[in-house]
Amino acid sequence: MTEEEPKVLTTREIKKLARPEFEKNPEKFYPTKVFQKWGFTRARCPKCDHYFWRHSEKVEVCGDSSCVGLYTFIGKGCGIGRKGQKLSYEGAWKTFKKSFENAKIPHTTIKRYPVVARWRPDVEYVAAGIYNFQPYCVTGEMDPPANPLIDAQFCLRFNDLDNIGITGRHYSGFNMLGVQVFNKPQKYIYFKEECVDFNLRWLTEELEIGLDEITLIEDVWAGGGNLGPSIEYFVGGLELGNMVFMQYKTHHNGTREPLQVQVIDVGIGLERIPWVVNGSLTSYFDVFPLAIEKLIKMTKAEINYGILKKFAPYSCLLDVDEAEGKVSEIWDSIAKKCNLTKEELLEGISVAKDIFLVCDHTRALLVAIEDGSLPSNVGGASNLRNILRRTFAVCAKRGWMEKMGMDGLMELFQCHKTELAPIMGEFKEYKSFRSIIEIEYKRWLNTDIDSKKKLDKLLKKKKGKLAPEDWILCITSFGLDPEQIASLTGLKIPDNLYYMIADHYERSVPPPPENLYQLAHLKPTIELWNTLENKFQFEGFKIVQVLENKKENDKLNIIILDKSIFYPTSGGQMNDTGKVSFACNKGEKPMEFDVIDVQKNAKSILLFLDHEIPTKDPKSLIGTQVSGSVNEKRRKQLKMHHTATHIISASAKKILGPHVWQHGAKKTEKRARIDITHYSTLSFEEERAIENEANRVIQLGLKVNKYDLEKQEAEKKYGFILYQGGIVPENTLRIVEIEGTDIEACCGTHVDNTADISLIRIINSRRISDGVLRIYFVAYARALDFTNQESDIVHDLSTQWSCPPKDITQTGKRFFETFKQNKKKINDMSVSIIKLSINSILKQEDKNFICRSNLEYRHFVSNVPQFAQQLKELEKSIIFYSQEYIYGLITNPNLDLNKLKAIIIGDPKVKKRQKNSSKKIQFVMKNKVMVKPKGKKKKVAIQITQISSFGDQKIHSIQKFLLENGFIEFN
């Protein structure tokens, strides 16, 4: 890391910085009064040294599993479970919902957000319920959908993959029961004391868990740029929930500042509630009853319940994150407690572990893909590919894929849908889902040969050993999954590998870009490009600020007006351009400037002018009246391209499937592009189908409605498809609706009717990264230009080939076939010429020959080495040359090869000037050639000097040198 680069702290490091201060001041940071009200007292855990609150002095440790040493509820249950009442996964959610909806301060239940966090520029997936409301609800810029609210939010976390199937409590995808409260200065709801009270009432009244069984640990929470004290509550050695009180905004270096909005964020693992109540061996039995039953039935797998029963209470100790490199010793210790050897224990639970792992990973994948993410090698989506390939590897190892096949795997996904529906709602029909899984399976079976070569090269470099960072490199860059690496290298997968990968991604997130202009004190610029979309001239607007351009040596060429009809670069749409006029000094006539760029900073619109403002006093310009105009032709074309982007997006989703989401877009005057999520490249037929569908929408002449809607109402009515183009951080959204086709929250400029666009043409498409395609297209006037260019090509070919347009394809095929036939004849003749020439040379008495040729270089490389043995035995040398190349085999020991090389390469100074030239000299000299003898499979090495050179050759100097050294010109 260079000195200029800021150090980016992880959430763990930020928490560590804050903990000492929080511990010293419990009354300041923690709700001590409500603890005392419920009869809890503060104590310090002798095992971990953390402070906690207990209801009975008989409780000596904090309640964390690592301190208790086992899950004490297994086989016993607690609360209503201990009284014989079984609690289901769905039932646990209902108890929570009932308790908080009927609390003293009633909570509103909201629907879950998609697990793909398209409203967040800094994360890819929702890892906690609060992610749905960061940063804008937390900062107060936007109102939450309800306040206070509760939800069951599906989350993805990939830092615990090492623990899944073992500890009983870890998942890659899970439902987090959430309580979120947003206390603004002008509207207080409730904070720490009430939060603890409501949670304890749910535990004791609905679940009937005794207070003596509950412990509350003081902790620190950090995430999503926020920080605050938190209270974790435990029952029977299991953490059930965490009450976070957000009080601070954190910076990447660990410093913090108070938040204006005080936020409560409660996160409870829904999967843990039925487990602790029922006292099951593992939570997976309570969460995946249908999936486990189906998988066992299809694969005939057998769980060793005897060993699992012995192991389950102690499984809490195997959290890799907390084991700190002592995983092997912990396994030894648990095995001893179970009266087993470590090998017997590992083997005894291995089938169960793999069943749980497959059920967990497939459920996480189901929700992620249903919500619009695709497995890939890029960014966070590489985690999806990782867990999918991990699933394939486990199933292959066990022989399960052979038994259940792809049909069986789809049945497993269906079980998850059935189990999740009561909480998350019904899943929509998703025709392309199976195709996505099948393609990933084929890719896994045929692991990229290049990836294996890279691994082999790395392994040789590291002398057969891979450090943790090497494993991460192979997974994140080479596209290999851990099981493949282990299989190919014979190395053991590091115990905490998945945690390290997650940590790697967290550290890879760059800090936000620096804000060059502090403009929060200014009133928001009144934006008129939407309400007056067809207004291109203005006058009477006033300057409110003049700025020096920080990127152009403080050049005074930026103005901010009180109103603006100029559209700033935003949402992928390029800015308007135009002209403005104003008096630069009092008493002077207005001066005209070109507006060359328009940007939005906070709530202000910055106009960048083509030259510096010649004013004596910049402050005197405040209040100066400005007139101007927007480039109408550019605005119109950008408007066409922006609306066409919406149409292409909707058309791609209709043709390819519901997994298609916009991943980015750019609309310029010349052309537009849209990036979409898709698992394979587009065929010509698919491109045409999307283009045809887009033009069908145009021909229908659909109305494009543009209107404002309250954010809560818009999300409730349309869902998160609104945010195809990204989040709009406003309480009121501008909705752009193409009737019956597409609906998005969008602030860009758009046509009033699809018919205004006239025509859309797709130029081409390409894969820009794994799982993401880029489609280039043009609309309106640019589409007509593109069509005319195609027509010109057809006309030119028709004229040159003297055939009607309909016969161009057949004529081209005929020409190409003739060309291939002639090329083959030329190749055959070239080979014959070379062989005849060399055979003739072999019969000559002279030893050294040079031969000027106009044949292609590749013919010499392919054919001359066949004569290497004969040339060596007869001590003959032969060099072929032309203006573009030199190739030869040399046996002459008296020839000064270094001098020949110097002549070919030339003066180093000249060579330096040629560095960027396409004809720069390249010279290669080897002391052997590889030849494949007739009838043999393997090549053999023949010791003979081989020289080759490419580039603009100095043939006269080379020829002169060789002739002076006894070479004879052979014609």
Question: Where are the model-predicted features located?
Answer:
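Intrinsically disordered, low-structural-confidence terminal and linker regions
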Residues: 1-24
